[in-house]
């Protein structure tokens, strides 16, 4: 990549973009694999220099609706209690994407039963999408979220996670709960 492309990648990451890709010329050039490796290294180093917890606290987010409020509260709670993860149970992916937009420094696991949602979440900043079976109760939702977050994030005994989602018998857009769980 050229210096300009390196600068563009770093600035895109700093500005909070969820995904980056090579330009056509670079991708079709002589060294596309090396270009991707360099781009990934630039992105990783740039992310390491960002203090996401300070950015979250200092930014004046506009809270327009309930899902914004729950997503913002989930991020704030995770930071405040030093949670090791956020588990989002989502049918449409909306709640996971809303949490992602706040750029929480806490890892996010997006649990979904919908393959289309799983694919979309793969492009959401900080979200690791996981396919799960449908929940038939909030107890199963909490158990699955806790178990999956432990496996995916490598959590240990006494680590805390924040779980959010909704139990609405298969309809999307009804996020209505936040819970803190200890592993």
What is the role of each PLM region?
Residues 39-74:
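Long, charged amphipathic helices and adjacent flexible linkers at domain junctions
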């Amino acid at each position: 990549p050229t210096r300009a492309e390196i600068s563009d990648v770093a600035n895109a990451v700093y500005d909070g973009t969820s995904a980056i890709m090579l330009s056509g010329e670079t991708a079709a050039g002589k060294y596309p694999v090396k270009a991707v490796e360099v781009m990934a290294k630039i992105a990783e180093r740039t992310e390491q220099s960002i203090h996401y917890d300070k950015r979250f606290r200092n930014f004046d987010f506009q809270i327009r609706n309930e899902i914004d409020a729950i997503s913002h509260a989930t991020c704030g709670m995770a930071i405040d209690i030093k949670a090791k993860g956020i588990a989002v149970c989502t049918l449409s992916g909306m709640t996971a994407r809303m949490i992602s937009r706040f750029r929480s420094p806490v890892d996010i696991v997006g649990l979904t039963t919908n393959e289309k949602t799983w694919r979309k979440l793969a492009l959401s900043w900080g979200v690791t999408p996981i396919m799960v079976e449908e929940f038939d109760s909030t107890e199963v939702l909490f158990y699955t979220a806790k178990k999956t977050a432990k496996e995916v994030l490598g959590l240990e005994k006494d680590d805390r996670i924040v779980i959010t989602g909704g139990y609405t018998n298969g309809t999307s857009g009804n996020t209505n709960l936040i819970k803190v769980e200890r592993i």
